[in-house]
Design a protein with these regions (language model features):
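Short, acidic, small-residue-rich periplasmic hinge/interaction motif at the N-terminus
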Residues: 40-42, 75-79, 91-130, 149-151, ...
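Short acidic/polar hinge/loop motifs at secondary-structure boundaries
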Residues: 64, 143, 169-195
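N-terminal periplasmic accessory domains that precede
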Residues: 89-95, 105, 137-140, 174-175, ...
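Outer-membrane beta-barrel signature, preferentially recognizing the C-terminal barrel domain
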Residues: 346, 451-454, 494-497, 525-579, ...
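Outer membrane beta-barrel strand-and-loop segments of large Gram-negative receptors
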Residues: 398, 407-411, 456-458, 553, ...
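Short, acidic Ser/Thr/Gly-rich low-complexity loop/linker segments typical of extracellular
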Residues: 45-60
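Surface-exposed extracellular loop regions of Gram-negative outer-membrane beta-barrel proteins
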Residues: 209-224, 263, 267, 291-295, ...
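Face-selective signature of the C-terminal outer-membrane beta-barrel domain
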Residues: 3, 292-316, 342-488, 511, ...
Length: 769
């Protein structure tokens, strides 16, 4: 840690004599602010570069401790550069004039996504670029460097699933990305090393900002999507809002239907006193539908203060799943049994509720951001396994599992200018109460009732200061957690615990000519989910059970990262050390070694290094995006049967192309390829990839849009993995119902984005639930 602090201090050296601060704003000739303009300081002696920055969304810039008499230069594509000699003045107003000779070139290059490095991450400008024409926010995120589209969401490479904010408000429902139109998005920022103001369990953040809401009156948009694969899926949404002066009312109502088909082949080898091997094939079908509702209100008290409320009420229909599992079992290489298992599963849900209250304001020079959340959900899970055995006794196993979750969370953040920088202080509090009961009438596994209560209070502080050649940000977060575990109504002292941790963070961002760089360190954590902590045992088959582990420790993660950007080229490298890494594991039943119990355990450490190289130029109507990613871990895994060296890197490549033909026609082609390698306690044993193509045509001045899309055209999105645990080796090959034809129709009338500014609290805790 001391060495890292020394490196960061050296990274920021270079203070000048006769220095003072200089700030100002850059406008065009119509007095509109110009964001992302380059503002640099040059030496008066030889015009060498000293320090530089880019303007914020409001056109503002700020330099601390610059030398008087040097030259300030402001420039932006399509405008004549502006220069002035620094004198004893502040709050400069700079007006850039259009460069008539460059206007034609600007028309050609104006579609290029514009990237810039911020004090937290890398921001991609969407407004007035080709990305604003893609359709939805989902489509935009698939084209943002550093983000990878996965089956169930998005991933920041080397960090995992990010927390997503829209206008500072925590995203609660993934369908918000489907409902948000690309034409309403201003920018997307990817933060791969979050600071202290975020929960320590948050390892990556995506911040989406929309264009400023304008105009009064009523507006709505309707979106209908039809998905045809082996099954039919539907997504139907209507969004509305009414705005009058300082008041805004808004709502969203939608229905989605998801049908799935998931075939797989699995082999498990268990080496105890007998060598057991199971080879089974599985065919699973599912049906899931839900009706979602969101309503809310926002009131602007004045130009600096607003309050709001949002309420979400969802009505999930019964989740229905059926499967056929056919397995052959051998013992020491000799045939033991053939078992056909017919499984049915029904999940019944109570309506889930979520409410958010917020206040965002300013009193004098102090910024205030307060949020309070409440969440409730409940589900019942009834499963029946009918096992038909050729050589042994056939049997039927039923189970009932009930879960109920309640969460209360709040967060307060205060910001104030201090010593030429900005100081943010605050605290976040969460309280969770989870009840989890499991019963098996046939007593093949024990019935139990668990209750988990956890409280977490986390004060934090963060300070930002502009030095002569870098922006320095330092933060500290302290989290105190109290966890109580109850089983069958009795408090279990040895599985309950209290602990506290400090999570420091520090980063430095600078610009040298056109090269932008950022070096950062952050300590994070990963907390086990409540299912991973539950001691309840669930039935898989007569050879396989699953349960949590109340003795799991939290991970403590050290991350160092370096990012750089030059024009349309981005590069990043990071080192990650996960102490007490949480992984899947297996244990054998003490009474019958043929029965394995899947659970979780902690490994001492998993160290990884991740790299990223991205290119995103614009060539006429064509905008290609190429990204190469590599992740390599160092892990020597010791089991009771063997020692494994799991050090082979995983490579991932993506190549996206967008063609803007004009007159409302847009063609998009996306592809990716993942190569085999090692990950945690296993390996990816099958290369996989996908090719998607979409064509969009807009009508009626972009109010009506028709889109045709084909996903996974060659049906190559197949996964294969192998895992190694204490006495068991498991290999699985899975195929997804991913080849689809999608038809989407969108109509919008008098629409503009919501002004709602609630950010929410306790999001990491919601994810654990």
């Amino acid at each position: 840690m001391e060495k890292l602090l020394l490196i960061l201090l050296l990274f920021c050296t270079g203070l000048r004599a006769n220095a003072q601060s200089v700030s100002g704003k850059v406008f065009d000739e119509n007095k509109k602010p110009i964001p992302y303009a380059n503002v640099i300081i040059l030496s008066a002696k030889d015009s060498t570069f000293i320090v530089g920055t880019t303007t914020a969304d409001d056109g503002s810039f700020n330099f601390k401790e610059v030398t008087l008499g040097n030259i300030l230069k402001a420039s932006f594509v399509g405008y004549e550069p502006f220069t002035t000699v620094l004198s004893n003045q502040d709050n400069l107003t700079i007006v850039l004039k259009e460069d008539a000779k460059m206007m034609k070139e600007v028309v050609v290059k104006g579609n290029a996504p514009l990237h810039k490095m911020t004090t937290e991450g890398i921001q991609t400008n969407i407004e007035n670029t080709i990305l604003s024409k893609l359709g939805t926010c989902e489509d935009v995120l698939a084209h943002v460097p550093g983000l990878t589209k996965k089956k169930d969401g998005y991933e920041v490479f080397g960090r995992g699933t990010p927390i997503i904010y829209i206008n500072g408000r925590q995203m609660r429902d993934a369908t918000e990305l489907e409902r948000l139109k690309s034409s309403d998005i201003k920018s997307v920022e990817v933060i791969s090393n979050p600071g202290s103001r975020y929960n320590a369990a948050v390892r990556a953040v995506v911040k989406i900002r929309t264009k400023k809401a304008v105009g009064d009156g009523f507006g709505f948009d309707v979106r209908s999507a039809y998905y045809q694969s082996e099954n039919v899926d539907l997504s139907e949404w209507v969004n509305w809002k009414y705005r009058h002066k300082r008041l805004e009312l808004f709502g969203a109502h939608g229905y989605s239907l998801d049908n799935g088909h998931y075939p797989s082949k699995t082999t498990t080898v268990v080496q105890t006193d007998t060598l057991w091997q199971q080879d089974f094939t599985q065919e699973v079908t599912q049906r899931n539908s839900i009706f979602k509702n969101t309503v809310g209100a926002d009131y602007q008290l004045n130009d600096s203060n607003s309050v709001g409320i949002k309420y979400m009420l969802n009505f999930p229909h019964d989740f229905l799943l059926s499967g056929i599992l056919s397995s052959d079992v051998t013992a020491n290489g000799t045939f033991y049994d053939h078992i056909n298992t017919f499984a049915t599963r029904k999940l019944s849900y109570r309506p889930s509720q979520f409410i958010n209250l917020y206040y965002v304001g300013k009193i004098g020079k102090m910024d205030i951001d307060f949020n309070a959340d409440y969440l409730y959900n409940k589900q019942n899970d009834h499963t029946t396994y009918r096992e038909e055995s050729r050589n042994k006794v056939s049997r039927t196993v039923t189970s009932d599992n009930q879960e109920r979750n309640r969460l209360i969370a709040s967060k307060l953040t205060l910001g104030y200018p201090v010593l030429g920088g900005n100081l943010s202080v605050g605290a976040e509090y969460t309280y969770t109460n989870r009840n989890d009961t499991y019963s098996n009438p046939e007593n093949y596994v024990p019935s139990s009732a668990a209750q988990l209560k956890e409280s977490n209070i986390a004060p934090f502080m963060e300070y930002k200061h502009q030095l002569s050649i870098c922006q320095l940000t330092a933060g500290l977060r302290w989290e105190a957690v109290r966890f109580n575990y109850y089983e069958n109504g009795q408090h279990i002292a040895n599985q309950s615990r209290s602990f506290s941790n400090l999570f420091p963070s520090i980063s430095a961002a600078t610009q040298i000519g056109g090269l932008q760089m950022q070096l950062s360190y952050a300590a994070r954590t990963r907390r086990p989910s409540y299912r991973q902590l539950s001691n309840n045992v669930s039935y898989g088959n007569r050879f396989l059970m699953q349960s949590g582990n109340p003795l799991l420790q939290h991970e403590y993660i050290h991350n160092i990262s370096l990012g750089a950007m030059w024009k349309f080229i981005q590069f990043g490298i990071s080192y990650n050390d996960r102490r007490h890494a949480i992984v899947f594991w297996s244990e054998q039943d003490s009474h019958n070694s043929a029965i394995s119990r899947i659970t979780n355990t902690n490994l001492p450490s998993i160290k990884t290094i991740s790299t990223q190289l991205a290119f995103s130029p614009t060539i006429g109507i064509w905008t290609p995006e190429f990204t190469a990613l590599m992740k390599k871990q160092w892990l020597t895994l010791h089991t009771s049967t063997k020692t494994y060296k799991l050090n082979k890197p995983i490579w991932q490549f993506s190549f996206n192309n967008t063609f803007d033909f004009g007159k409302g026609w847009l063609l998009s082609m996306e592809s990716y390829y993942i190569k085999r390698g090692d990950a945690e306690i296993g390996s990816v044993v099958r290369n996989s990839g996908s090719v998607d193509i979409s064509l969009t045509k807009s009508f009626l001045k972009d109010r009506l849009a028709l889109r045709i899309r084909g996903t996974d055209l060659f049906h190559t999105r197949k996964e294969g993995g192998i895992s190694y645990t204490e006495s068991m080796e498991t290999q699985q090959i899975s195929t997804y119902d991913s080849r689809q034809f999608v038809l989407t129709v969108t109509y919008k009338f008098n629409t503009s984005r919501s002004k709602y500014k609630g950010t929410g609290a306790g999001q990491a805790e919601k994810n654990r639930l």
